[in-house]
């Protein structure tokens, strides 16, 4: 829903503002102590509403960066991953949901600066990871602009 890393899902705090669903998420980069929160948009607002994402109950929550415990979360995430595999297509991994969000940002023509902020990584990482999707997205966007310009002539 929000493109969070599996280590970040316990910190997701969904909220609604101006009719849009967002979340505040603790950014947890690999091998780093988390200190920063970011704001992320639910790209599929209809899904967020259908899943009642504003009312999700979690078995564990992180409300402050100081509450982050890597060992405890690894244990919880392992349990969650096993449950997820049993309930879904075994080939689908929780991290695939993060990548789907990343590709969706390209398909929705969200610029790489904004998309990388939503996902909590650098613009360079975002651009290189989702380059193919952005290449196609950029081509489609350019074609649409050309078509609009030709129609206005």
Language model features: what each stretch is:
Residues 4-7, 11-49:
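Conserved tyrosine-mediated DNA breakage-rejoining catalytic core shared by Y-recombinases
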Residues 8-9, 92-93, 102, 110-120:
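Active-site-proximal segment of tyrosine recombinases
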Residues 12, 105-106:
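Short helix-to-turn junction characteristic of helix-turn-helix DNA-binding domains
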Residues 15-21, 110-129:
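Short, polar N-cap/turn motifs at the start of nucleic acid-interacting alpha helices
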Residues 27-32, 119-144:
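Catalytic-site neighborhood detector that most strongly recognizes the C-terminal catalytic loop/helix
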Residues 144-153:
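Intrinsically disordered, low-complexity basic tails/linkers immediately adjacent to helix-turn-helix/homeobox/MYB/SANT
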